[in-house]
Design a protein with these regions (language model features):
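Short, polar/acidic, helix-capping and beta-turn segments at strand->helix junctions
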Residues: 1-156
Length: 156
């Protein structure tokens, strides 16, 4: 029996790739350099493309933050699919930079970004789905979004 594709795993997990909002700046969503693919920061969006907003430690709790980070991961996957045509061309996750819109007192940024990291491990497994990572707090993010994540992947 052949291994499940990433798209099949997403469907099995009940996830749907979101519609990406239009870019607000002058940049590329993805840039391929050899066997590396760099992904610009992706904001927390619902499946319909609307933003998930709010500040952790004020309007949003830890679970809502994790869900927002997972949605960032799904948005990143939307861009990967648009760039590569097939998520099976991703060999492994190399790096994530997770930025959390949080109050000065909030301290659980890594737990929030786990929402994205857990998704990628579910899809690619422990070895290929887990890369190096930073999780930092921000005083604000564009449009008051809850989370923004940028990523780097190794591709085939």
């Amino acid at each position: 029996m052949p291994a499940k594709t990433i798209e099949e795993k997403l469907k099995e997990l009940g996830y749907e790739l979101p519609i990406l909002p239009s870019s607000k700046g002058i940049y590329k969503r993805c840039l391929v350099d050899g066997n590396h693919l760099y992904v610009s920061g992706h904001i927390s969006v619902n499946t319909d493309g609307s933003s998930i907003t709010g500040k952790l430690g004020k309007e949003l709790n830890e679970e809502q933050g994790k869900a927002a980070a997972r949605q960032c991961g799904l948005a990143i996957l939307s861009s990967l699919k648009a760039e590569l045509g097939d998520l099976g061309k991703v060999k492994r996750v190399m790096k994530l930079l997770g930025m959390v819109n949080a109050t000065a007192e909030y301290e659980k940024h890594p737990i929030v970004i786990n929402g994205c990291s857990e998704l990628f491990v579910q899809l690619w497994g422990e070895d290929s789905g887990k890369g190096v990572r930073s999780a930092v707090g921000m005083g604000s993010l564009p449009g008051n979004v809850a989370v923004e994540i940028e990523a780097m992947f190794e591709i085939y």
